[in-house]
Amino acid sequence: MRKIIVGSRRSKLALTQSQQFIDQLKRKHPNLEIEIKEIVTKGDQIVNVQLSKVGGKGLFVKEIEQALYDGTIDFAIHSLKDVPSVLPEGLTLGCIPVREDARDAYIAKHHIPLHELKPGSIVGTSSLRRGAQLLDQYPHLEIKWIRGNIDTRLAKLRDEDYDAIILAAAGLNRMGWDKSIVTEYLNPELMLPAIGQGALGIECRSDDAEVLALLKSVHDEETELCTEAERTFLRLMDGSCQVPIAGHATMVGESIEFTGLIMSPDGKEKYKVTHSGGNPIEIGTQVAKAMEQNGAKAIIETLNQDI
């Protein structure tokens, strides 16, 4: 087997989860020689603007995909939620390993439960999806934009006027944060996760048989089935980072149960549909069609026009 060059974003979380995946791969292939190549993406360079206002898709993957085309890397390790639902020609997801915790984590300055936050309390998030769901259930709260890595956001919670912040549980777990910092984990019934949240997507060239065979050894079929339902829904709804869109699928016995959600950013319009079955593409499609019939597509079209 040739030496493998792996592409990763330069952030601490990206490098940590990349190393964790490599360790998983090396347990299956102890003699594998592998090296990480750090790549800065457009999304990494945009630090003072809300990503939903930038528009476009693939803000955290395009430069890495170019490295795949150029042949300077052999595969790329992405957070699946950053990967557009339609991949460029010649590239494929070679594997999706076992998913981490898909939930969101609510962290309050004084560990005040979410339902006890007083009117006007400030909750920090970089996600329209989280903001819309919070405003739907707790319209008395104020949502304030926050960016930065986990350390930066926790420091802002401590030092600035935020009463609480919401982060992805998967990122906290991968970075080794103690669960005691989390005030409460938000179950999908309360806060539906982003499409693909908690999962990694390992992207490679479609014609690289050697790498595809290597990646297959750490692929998880259950995670693939669930995320395929989610990503089918995302693709059909043409969801992007300027649309509050969410979706989460789980296996219930032999069946895939998927719930999709589309909201207006202010939380006042809400479309939520659940379907279950054995075929992930059919389930994602059924939820998307039900959404269109209910009028959810109008929210997306309006928001896309505003960019």
Curated annotation (Swiss-Prot):
Q: Where is the signal peptide?
A: none
Q: Name its GO BP terms in alphabetical order.
A: protoporphyrinogen IX biosynthetic process
What InterPro entries does its record include?
HemC, Porphobilin_deaminase_cofac_BS, Porphobilin_deaminase_N, Porphobilinogen_deaminase_C, Porphobilinogen_deaminase_C_sf
- Gene Ontology, cellular component aspect: cytoplasm
- Describe cofactor binding as the record notes it: Binds 1 dipyrromethane group covalently.
What are the record keywords, sorted?
A: Porphyrin biosynthesis, Transferase
**What's the Enzyme Commission number for this chain?**
2.5.1.61
What is any Pfam family matched here? Porphobil_deam
The answer to whether keyword Transferase applies is yes
Q: What is the reaction catalyzed? A: 4 porphobilinogen + H2O = hydroxymethylbilane + 4 NH4(+)
Cofactor(s), by name = dipyrromethane
Q: In which pathway does it act?
A: Porphyrin-containing compound metabolism; protoporphyrin-IX biosynthesis; coproporphyrinogen-III from 5-aminolevulinate: step 2/4
The answer to whether UniProt assigns keyword Transferase to this entry is: yes
- List GO molecular-function terms, semicolon-separated: hydroxymethylbilane synthase activity
**Assembly, per entry:** Monomer.
Functional summary from the UniProt entry: Tetrapolymerization of the monopyrrole PBG into the hydroxymethylbilane pre-uroporphyrinogen in several discrete steps.
Q: Which family does it belong to?
A: Belongs to the HMBS family.
User: HAMAP family attached here?
Assistant: Porphobil_deam
- What more does the record tell us? The porphobilinogen subunits are added to the dipyrromethane group.
Q: What PANTHER family does its record include?
A: PORPHOBILINOGEN DEAMINASE
Record protein name field: Porphobilinogen deaminase
Q: Which organism is it from?
A: Macrococcus caseolyticus (strain JCSC5402)
Gene for this protein?
A: hemC
